[in-house]
């Protein structure tokens, strides 16, 4: 069975930057074990699987290791595929997901995705995280993910993690966001997941569900410009609107093709 697949760089206007996601279009759901094999074979941070059922798109996300409950950049990539390749006459699409309905809209300049607002609260840092860090944070908070706040952008950029120690803890489906005020934007971040095939995520939309409310309150701003300073880098505009976080970003298609899924 030949199945359509798209590879998209999300939260960027340029190829080979942002965060790459694969979007696989399925006629119906196949066993979870096979979804995981496809995600592992794709070897990108996340693969989004789409099924049209009853006139609605149903969306699931897989890393090379597990199914996860939310993925911002793969949702943006899926929205880009639908609105650019499948239904270019439309400007919005809704996805049914384990985290509820997620909307992706397109205007003249960017895509907008609405994700759950997850304000972080003060927390204790597990020793397997603190001992793995080359520099301790000024502040520790937690929602789904741990949020570690540093004094400067350079501290975030230079931070090193001892993977052997870091991998002693399992935070599925969460991870660790490290953040600081930015020099030429409102805030910067990096994101790490222990025990994951890909430890540092290039751009993490879901982490901004907690980063955005934190920095919005701290800076007293509604609209924030953010950069994730991974090796690929990515840019987002973020806003808190009630129980949602609005993320604005671009996406570009890298490849279009088919994969072979043999019948069992």
List each model region and its residues.
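Active-site proximal loop and beta-alpha junction motif in alpha/beta enzyme cores
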Residues: 1-70, 75-264
């Amino acid at each position: 069975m030949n199945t359509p697949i798209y590879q998209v760089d999300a939260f960027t206007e340029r190829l080979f930057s942002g965060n790459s996601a694969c979007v696989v279009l399925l006629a119906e759901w196949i066993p979870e074990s096979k979804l995981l094999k496809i995600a592992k074979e794709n070897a990108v941070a996340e693969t989004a699987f789409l099924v049209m059922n009853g006139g609605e798109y149903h969306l699931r996300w897989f890393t090379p290791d597990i199914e996860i409950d939310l993925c911002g950049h793969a949702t943006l990539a899926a929205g880009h595929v639908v609105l650019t390749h499948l239904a270019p006459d439309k400007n919005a699409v809704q996805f049914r997901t384990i985290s509820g309905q997620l909307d992706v809209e397109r205007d003249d300049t960017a895509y907008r995705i609405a994700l759950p607002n997850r304000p972080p609260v003060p927390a204790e840092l597990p020793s397997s995280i603190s001992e793995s860090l080359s520099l301790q944070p000024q502040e520790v908070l937690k929602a789904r993910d741990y949020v570690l706040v540093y004094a400067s952008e350079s501290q975030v950029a230079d931070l090193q993690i001892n993977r052997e120690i870091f991998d002693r803890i399992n935070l599925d489906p969460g991870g660790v966001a490290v953040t600081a005020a930015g020099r030429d934007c409102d805030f910067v971040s990096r994101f790490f997941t222990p025990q994951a095939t890909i430890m540092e995520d290039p751009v993490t939309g879901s982490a901004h569900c907690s980063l955005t409310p934190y920095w919005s309150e701290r800076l007293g701003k509604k609209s924030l410009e953010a950069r994730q300073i991974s090796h690929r880098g990515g840019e987002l505009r973020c806003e808190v609107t009630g129980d949602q976080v609005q993320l604005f970003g671009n996406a570009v298609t890298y490849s279009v093709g088919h994969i072979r899924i043999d019948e069992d």
